Amino acid sequence: MIQYLVILLDDTSVSFCHYGNGHKERRLMPADTLKAGILYGMKENLNIQFVYPDYDLPEEYDKIIESVDHSKIKPASRQKGADVVVIDGIEEAGRTDVRSGTAYVLRTDKTGLFGGHDIIVKLLQHADRLNITLTDVETFTDDDFDKYKDMLKQLAADVEKMYAEGHSPQLNILTDRMMLDKMNNCGAGDTTITLAPDGNFYVCPAFYQQPGGYAIGNLKDGLDIKNSQLYRLDHGPLCRICDAYQCRRCIWLN
């Protein structure tokens, strides 16, 4: 059952997951499409999440967006008013002003992760929640997994110290694994769909922002999800018996 509608406000809207955005030229979603998307979300009683590009929107768009309850996902360079702030890489993380009351997503490759311990700890000292998303997880070797294990041990000690001092940050790759008692996947194609600037629905932003993606309907004709059961956890023979509950079970990577 669909519960969330992700609306990409521009072709260059920030990526908040494993995929990179292959679109480099700005193309703002037409105002009429935005209004129609919001109306669709309201009619279907969906939670709406707006994903912003790295530039200020026209005032008209701000008024349209504020006409409905929603969450804002923004790049770190435009984090004012954001519910979720996306930090693209360890280098950007080092210069990002982190504040409480906001969730942060750190997109990084394995090199950045293994070499960015001090920066990650600094983020955790100020953020209430940090999600670390690896952009090259498919390239991991046995040696990388050993490094990852050591990294988690270091972070576990750091987070334990923060908890003892009265600050209780959430870290998806660490505390989620301890707190969750069931799968907490992204739900692309099952509980979440994406509306792109072209007026079409997609399984998730990656299916629009990367080559090889495909639409699953449009605002005019509605959703048309082929073999929709395949997006569900109960049709994933390996995932449904896995206990790595913090895994996002990325539909795009799979």
Model-derived segments and spans:
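Residues at the N-termini of beta-strands
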Residues: 47-48, 84, 129-131, 241, ...
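Short beta-strand/turn micro-motifs composed of small residues
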Residues: 9, 52, 106-108
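Short, well-ordered coil/turn segments that N-cap beta-strands
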Residues: 1-3, 44-48, 69-71, 128, ...
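Radical SAM enzyme [4Fe-4S]-AdoMet core and its adjacent flexible, acidic
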Residues: 24, 29, 83-197, 202, ...
